[in-house]
UniProtKB/Swiss-Prot annotation:
<feature type="transmembrane region" description="Helical">
    <location>
        <begin position="973"/>
        <end position="991"/>
    </location>
</feature>
<feature type="transmembrane region" description="Helical">
    <location>
        <begin position="924"/>
        <end position="945"/>
    </location>
</feature>
<feature type="transmembrane region" description="Helical">
    <location>
        <begin position="366"/>
        <end position="385"/>
    </location>
</feature>
<keyword id="KW-0812">Transmembrane</keyword>
<dbReference type="GO" id="GO:1990281">
    <property type="term" value="C:efflux pump complex"/>
</dbReference>
<dbReference type="GO" id="GO:0005886">
    <property type="term" value="C:plasma membrane"/>
</dbReference>
<feature type="transmembrane region" description="Helical">
    <location>
        <begin position="10"/>
        <end position="28"/>
    </location>
</feature>
<feature type="topological domain" description="Cytoplasmic">
    <location>
        <begin position="497"/>
        <end position="538"/>
    </location>
</feature>
<feature type="transmembrane region" description="Helical">
    <location>
        <begin position="392"/>
        <end position="413"/>
    </location>
</feature>
<keyword id="KW-0046">Antibiotic resistance</keyword>
<protein>
    <recommendedName>
        <fullName>Multidrug resistance protein MexB</fullName>
    </recommendedName>
</protein>
<keyword id="KW-1003">Cell membrane</keyword>
<feature type="transmembrane region" description="Helical">
    <location>
        <begin position="474"/>
        <end position="496"/>
    </location>
</feature>
<comment type="subunit">
    <text>Component of the MexAB-OprM multidrug efflux complex, composed of six MexA subunits forming a hexameric tube, binding to a MexB trimer, which interact with the trimeric OprM outer membrane channel protein. OprM is thought to not directly contact MexB; instead, MexA joins MexB and OprM by forming a funnel-like hexamer anchored to the inner membrane. MexA may initially form a hexameric ring complex with MexB prior to OprM, then OprM undergoes a conformational change as it contacts MexA, allowing the periplasmic gate to open.</text>
</comment>
<dbReference type="GO" id="GO:0140330">
    <property type="term" value="P:xenobiotic detoxification by transmembrane export across the cell outer membrane"/>
</dbReference>
<feature type="topological domain" description="Cytoplasmic">
    <location>
        <begin position="1"/>
        <end position="9"/>
    </location>
</feature>
<feature type="topological domain" description="Periplasmic">
    <location>
        <begin position="558"/>
        <end position="871"/>
    </location>
</feature>
Length: 1046
């Protein structure tokens, strides 16, 4: 095939240009992401049950829905949380690869079976089913720069004017508003109600009767009488729109004709629909909307669309209102992709310099360099065909592929020049002869490297998604590289290279290149003598090899494990939890102190702080608080001390001084869709029905043991501690004797102490809600219970304390379930210097000490880590097996592949040493780097074994053939290995966004390639001679036995 294109170079150029054109067009359509869709798809079901406790929500809503979710296809796990504000979320997580649209339809179908079984109030509130990931993509905030708007005004504007356009934006899955829109708030005065002998239920009924929209029909509507000339719509009573209209609602007409209106018993006015959340931006009143990404959506495109939507709305915003972005996870996407592209450019430059050093000819160096854009652009075309995106994983694959793809072209060019120098042939004739020599080696290398990476594409789960990105990228690049090496490179050699005089190996050149050539020639002679010595004394070196293999196995058992390396995402979280039963005012004091520290003491790194009270990732309530901390761009905070991890450590040390609150500062995980924090994530589960109290005791024991374990830090419950609750007990017999109905009692309690949604009203053209509730000063203490009255069947007003009492007890404001059983979520991090795998092992030891009946399950990132850890050995074994079979097919021998395969531990030991010395972990990126090392180690061995086998077949002895092959292939092996190592160096020394992943993959590959090159060039001939001799002796014995039998 190569001869055809050597004679038709333009044909070869046309093929290359078509490949480049296809790839270039593909780049324009490929989406850009930090990572592919690693997180499994999840469907969230959200329900509200106003006034209900967490326990009530769990018993009457959560369990009813969970029981109907059985039988859903591809279900991985199901989790739920119920809060004391009546809210509830069930998250149904599916196996990786499940179509999220199909998953949502299945969940909705199952939900239809559960809906009739839910309380009427829940059905009335509605049930939301969304395709959204767990974490927030970004927060859009609004502040009043001139102080003319309150937080209620800002919240109302977001809900009324921003929420709907954003929810319609492509890629938005769900949202949460930190605040609420206006509602018509009716604050009841119990004393005035009693004086007029009215109850909250009377008020609710009057509002429902008089705040209505009536469909009144038409005048002259069809069918009409003959001759009718008029047709007009009748406008009947409409919904009320102003506070004054509500104030005039008639409640009662006394016998003397006097009237009691709503304003006589209540304060009426616009107020917030919900008062549980208070947001601030850098200390100023604010509101915000947190946006979650739809499952499978592109984060970068969605964020751009959101910003464009906001930009379209800004001209219509009130004067003094300013939009801010206090939390955004997408800058790291652009920055990390930019860093990898920069690394790609640096790698290409370094590879070019290495090639020029060895080839010492600009034309010869240019030929492999031309292969780089052809292969890289062609690889983008393949990525588009497979539906992939441009992300850090595919770009890492490109960086690794640069060293691999120039290898093939270098081998071709170097061999053509060697043939010209040794035999004095013209470039065209040398190219023809050279391709006849190395064509088999090129195909063999491509097969082996493809065999290393191809099995990765068939693994499942989130780890399989990561493996697949590398696999398809590198295998595509390798395939295109061989095509270019067989088609374009020989054609270029034939047309671009200048003839070389016979016997000219460059040692007579002057200057630096001449010195380098003489030094390398001298090194080659020394190398030949070294190989001859090793082949003469094989036993000691085989023993050394056994020691290396033993050391490799020992290091594999000692190196810490992880799923993915932690990354500086440019954002930080701080979570506040004040003592159970704390008021919002008390929590706000702690949040203010936290914000002041961050803005004053960490101003060099912190850009803004958006705080929220009433909410955090652990739950909702007045004792909860949260801070979204946006850091300055990476280039404005250089140095390790300004990284998000060091900032979190300093902040945590300061927050430990807070005596009246628990405050945790933590960075988000490397894959945001898999959780909200770095470290480990698990659920303690009540597997035997031991009850809430035993489970709570088990959790507390776990936290105590974890605090004493040196392998763990920042271990905390991702929930809320039991808090004081006032249990109202109704004496049914007394109530019946007094003529009071239980329905009236329940209605009064719900309205007065809770918040009752009555119906809707129209505010500036938008439908909003009407809420009925007792005045704040009539529901602050248990004694206020006596202020409220219920009317009995005789029309008399009976105080609550006549039939009701109360007592204090403890209860949970948040209840969790995992896979259908009560559970409590726990988060934590490994101690400095340890990996998440070490921390998870420590956790598993602690769980063994918990009470019987309490189990555990990993979730989120930890679930994926356990899954990836179990897959890694199978991945290595399968890759090695496929490599062996490819080599056996290539050499038509079962023995020769062993001499190639035995070199693998020499590369692996270097990767393990480099990774351990740098304090890194055995994570997914390390595993990919290790497979790359395995492939390149085998490639170097193939270059020697291929030539040794040919020389042996030409009649030379095994030892002589091995030494001659080593001499001939030393220069290309060193050149290609050095080119690859230097091409990966930018990954290992990178800084800024995405540097954690780059270090993880670059460090192992460099270490592995150094040892694979330095050691393998001596051990490969030893393996070839030892294996060939062994199998030859065995074959001779078998032949002799056969002949003897005859």
């Amino acid at each position: 095939m190569s001869k055809f294109f050597i004679d038709r170079p333009i044909f070869a150029w046309v093929i290359a240009l078509v490949i480049m054109l296809a790839g270039g067009l593909s780049i324009l359509s490929l989406p850009v992401n930090q990572y592919p869709a690693i997180a499994p798809p999840a469907i969230a079901v959200q329900v509200s049950y106003p006034g209900a406790s967490a326990e009530t929500v769990q018993d009457t809503v959560v369990q009813v829905i969970e029981q109907q979710m059985n039988g859903i296809d591809n279900l991985r796990y199901i989790s739920s949380e119920s809060n004391s504000d009546g809210s509830m979320t069930i998250t149904v997580t599916f196996e990786q690869g499940t179509d999220p649209d199909i998953a949502q339809v299945q969940v909705q179908n199952k939900l239809q079976l559960a809906t009739p079984l839910l309380p009427q109030e829940v059905q009335r509130q509605g049930i939301r089913v969304t395709k959204a990931v767990k974490n927030f993509l970004m927060v859009v905030g609004v502040v009043s720069t001139d102080g003319s708007m309150t937080k209620e005004d800002l919240s109302n504007y977001i809900v009324s004017n921003i929420q709907d356009p954003l929810s319609r934006t492509k890629g938005v899955g769900d949202f949460q508003v930190f605040g609420s829109q206006y509602s018509m708030r009716i604050w009841l005065d119990p004393a005035k109600l009693n004086s007029y002998q009215l109850t909250p239920g009377d008020v609710s009924s009057a509002i429902q009767a008089q705040n209505v929209q009536i469909s009144s029909g038409q005048l002259g509507g069809l069918p009409a009488v003959k001759g009718q000339q008029l047709n007009a719509t009748i406008i009947g009573k409409t919904r009320l729109q102003t506070a004054e209209q509500f104030e005039n609602i008639l409640l009662k007409v006394n016998p003397d004709g006097s009237q009691v209106r709503l304003k006589d018993v209540a304060d009426v006015g616009l107020g917030g629909q919900d008062y549980s959340i208070n947001a601030q931006f850098n200390g100023s009143p604010a509101s915000g909307i947190a946006i979650k990404l739809a499952t499978g959506a592109n984060a970068l495109d969605t964020a751009k669309a959101i910003r464009q939507t906001i930009a379209n709305l800004e001209p219509f915003m009130p004067q003094g209102m300013k939009v801010v972005y206090p939390y955004d996870t997408t800058p790291v996407v652009s920055a990390s992709i930019h860093e990898v592209v920069k690394t790609l450019g640096e790698a290409i430059l370094l590879v070019f310099l290495v090639m020029y050093l060895f080839l010492q000819n600009f034309r010869a160096t240019l030929i492999p360099t031309i292969a780089v854009p052809v292969v890289l652009l062609g690889t983008f075309g393949v990525l588009a065909a497979f539906g992939f995106s441009i992300n850090t994983l595919t770009m890492f694959g490109m960086v690794l592929a640069i060293g691999l793809l120039v290898d093939d072209a270098i081998v071709v060019v170097e061999n053509v020049e060697r043939v010209m120098a040794e035999e004095g042939l013209s470039p065209r004739e040398a190219a023809r002869k050279s391709m006849g020599q190395i064509q088999g080696a090129l195909v063999g290398i491509a097969m082996v490297l493809s065999a290393v990476f191809l099995p990765m594409a068939f693994f499942g789960g989130s780890t399989g998604v990561i493996y697949r990105q590398f696999s398809i990228t590198i295998v595509s690049a390798m395939a295109l590289s061989v095509i270019v090496a067989l088609i374009l490179t020989p054609a270029l050699c034939a047309t671009m290279l200048k003839p070389i005089e016979k016997g000219d190996h460059g040692e007579h050149k002057g200057g630096f290149f001449g010195w380098f050539n003489r030094m390398f020639l001298s090194t080659t002679h020394g190398y030949e003598r070294g190989v001859a010595s090793i082949l003469k004394h094989r036993a000691p070196y085989l023993l050394i090899y056994v020691v290396i293999v033993a050391g490799m196995i020992w290091m594999f058992t000692r190196i810490p494990t992880a799923f993915l390396p932690d990354e500086d995402q440019g954002v930080l979280f701080a979570q506040v939890q004040t003592p159970p039963g704390s008021s919002a005012e008390r929590t706000q004091v702690v949040v203010d102190s936290m914000r002041e520290y961050l803005l004053e003491k960490e101003s060099s790194s912190v850009s803004s702080v958006f705080t929220v009270t009433g909410f955090n990732f652990a739950g909702r309530g007045q004792s909860s608080g949260m801070a979204f901390i946006m850091l300055k761009p990476w280039e404005e905070r250089p140095g390790g001390e300004n990284s998000v991890f060091e900032l979190a450590k300093r902040a945590q040390m300061h927050f430990f001084s807070f005596k009246d609150a628990m405050v945790f500062a933590f960075a988000p995980p490397s894959v945001l869709e898999l959780g909200n924090a770095t470290g480990f994530d698990l659920f303690l589960q009540d597997q035997a029905g031991v009850g809430h109290e035993v489970l709570l005791q088990a959790r507390n024991k776990f936290l105590m043991l974890a605090a004493q374990n040196p392998a763990l830090q920042r271990v905390r419950p991702n929930g809320m501690s039991d808090e004081p609750q006032y249990k109202l007990e109704i004496d049914d017999e007394k109530a019946s004797a007094l003529g009071v109905s239980l329905a009236d009692i329940n209605s009064t309690v719900s309205i007065a102490w809770g918040s009752s949604y009555v119906n809707d009203f129209i505010d500036r053209g938008r439908v909003k809600r009407v809420y009925l509730q007792g005045r704040p000063d009539a529901r602050m203490n248990p004694d206020d219970l006596s202020k409220w009255y219920v009317r009995n069947d005789k029309g008399e007003m009976v105080p609550f304390n006549a039939f009701a009492t109360g007592k204090w007890e403890y209860g949970s404001p948040k209840l969790e379930r995992y896979n259908g059983v009560p559970a409590m979520e726990i988060l934590g991090e490994p101690a400095p210097g340890l990996s998440s795998g070490d921390a998870m092992a420590a956790v598993e030891e602690i769980v063994k000490q918990l009470p019987k009946g309490v189990g555990y399950s990993w979730t989120g990132l930890s679930y994926e880590e356990r899954l990836s850890g179990s897959q890694a050995p199978a991945l290595y074994a399968l890759s090695l097996l496929v490599v062996f079979l490819c080599l056996a097919a290539l050499y038509e021998s079962w023995s020769i592949p062993f001499s190639v395969m035995l070199v693998v531990p020499l590369g692996v030991i270097g990767a393990l040493l480099a990774t351990s010395m740098r304090g890194l972990s055995n994570d997914v990126f390390f595993q990919v780097g290790l497979l790359t090392t395995i492939g390149l180690s085998a490639k170097n061995a193939i270059l020697i074994v291929e030539f040794a086998k040919e020389l042996h077949e030409q009649g030379k002895g095994i030892v002589e053939a091995a030494i001659e092959a080593c001499r001939m292939r030393l220069r290309p092996i060193v050149m290609t290995s050095l080119a690859f190592i230097l091409g990966v160096v930018p990954l290992a020394i990178s800084t800024g966004a995405g540097s954690g992943s780059q270090h993880a993959i670059g460090t192992g590959v460099i270490g592995g390639m150094v040892t694979a090159t330095v050691l393998a060039i001596f051990w490969v001939p030893l393996f070839y001679v030892a294996v060939s001799t062994l199998f030859k002796d065995e074959a001779s014995k078998q032949q002799a036995s056969v002949e003897k039998g005859q």
